[in-house]
Amino acid sequence: LAPADRDLAPGDPREIEIESSPHLVVTSLGGNDYNHQGGDTPSNASFTAASAAFTDSLFERYANPELVVIHICGMGSPAEAAFDPDNNRCRPCPHVRDATTAYVAANPTRRVHYLLVPCNGSVVDDVGDIGCNGHKNRLGQAQVADFLEPRIRSIMGW
């Protein structure tokens, strides 16, 4: 949409004031850093530093002592990898895991977790769950949600 057509979200969405503070933020990081980059991917050190800065920004932005941040990774399937071999959704996962582990070690009072959603077909099984350009459709998204829900529930103590 052209800027004049942005009636629902005028201005920079990063500057929208939020009235309340969430108890949970779930992120999916690393996919664009480690796929489709022609081999020009970040080092573990630079990715870990950027991930830490981003995670810090969440705690600064929301200033909720009860805030839980969960960095998820994966969510792929064999069909997605076959459709686009340079879009391996699990490729960034060791980097995201290591960055999260380093963050937790440096910030033990903050509730930050890592969750891997496998890419082996055990979650998104390639049966009617892939839509446009190899992305998950509504069924694929529901499969990921069904996998994550009990794990998030456990982390949150719900």
Model regions and ranges:
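Conserved SGNH/GDSL esterase-like catalytic core that processes O-acyl groups on lipids
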Residues: L1-A52, E80-P94, G121, G131
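Surface-exposed acidic, glycine-flexible loop patches that form ligand/cofactor-binding
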Residues: R6-S20, D56-N64, A105-A106, R153-W158
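Structural recognition of the beta-strand scaffold that forms the well-ordered cores
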Residues: H23-S28, D33, V68-C73, H113-V117
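Catalytic His-Asp segment of secreted/periplasmic serine-dependent ester chemistry enzymes
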Residues: N35, M75-W158
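Extracytoplasmic, non-cytosolic globular domains
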Residues: P42-G74, P78-A79, N88-T101, L148
